[in-house]
């Protein structure tokens, strides 16, 4: 096996949307950093049965905001 080709695998903390945290091992970030989730099983529509809230910074939201006043008028 080749040496020094694999990313560093270390312990990080993951913070859920309700503020609870747990430790796991990952290649994300650096040792001890906190990964804050925006969507998790406690808030995702697939697990809660509710409608999914689109993020304001999401691509669909940006598109809809940009073109909210645009209307296609049919010419005869």
From Swiss-Prot:
One of the protein's GO biological processes: translation
Keywords for this protein: Ribonucleoprotein, Ribosomal protein, RNA-binding, rRNA-binding
GO cellular component term of the entry, any: ribosome
UniProt xrefs under InterPro entries: Ribosomal_bL28/bL31-like_sf, Ribosomal_bL31, Ribosomal_bL31_sf
Superkingdom assignment: Bacteria
Keyword Ribosomal protein: yes
Keyword rRNA-binding part of the UniProt annotation: yes
Entry's Gene Ontology molecular function annotations: rRNA binding; structural constituent of ribosome
One Pfam family linked to the record: Ribosomal_L31
PANTHER family, alphabetized: 50S RIBOSOMAL PROTEIN L31, CHLOROPLASTIC (PTHR33280), LARGE RIBOSOMAL SUBUNIT PROTEIN BL31A (PTHR33280:SF6)
Subunit details: Part of the 50S ribosomal subunit.
NCBIfam families assigned: L31 (TIGR00105), PRK00528.1 (NF001809)
Family recorded in the similarity comment: Belongs to the bacterial ribosomal protein bL31 family. Type A subfamily.
Biological function: Binds the 23S rRNA.
Stated name of the protein: Large ribosomal subunit protein bL31
Species in which this protein is naturally found: Pelagibacter ubique (strain HTCC1062)
Organismal lineage: Bacteria, Pseudomonadati, Pseudomonadota, Alphaproteobacteria, Candidatus Pelagibacterales
The gene coding this protein: rpmE
């Amino acid at each position: 096996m080749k040496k020094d080709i694999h990313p560093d695998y270390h312990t990080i903390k993951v913070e859920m949307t309700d503020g609870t945290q747990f430790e796991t091992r990952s290649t994300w970030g650096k040792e001890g950093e906190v990964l804050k989730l925006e969507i998790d099983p406690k808030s995702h529509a697939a697990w809660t049965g509710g409608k999914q809230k689109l993020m304001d910074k999401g691509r669909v939201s940006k598109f809809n905001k940009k073109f909210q006043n645009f209307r296609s008028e049919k010419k005869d």
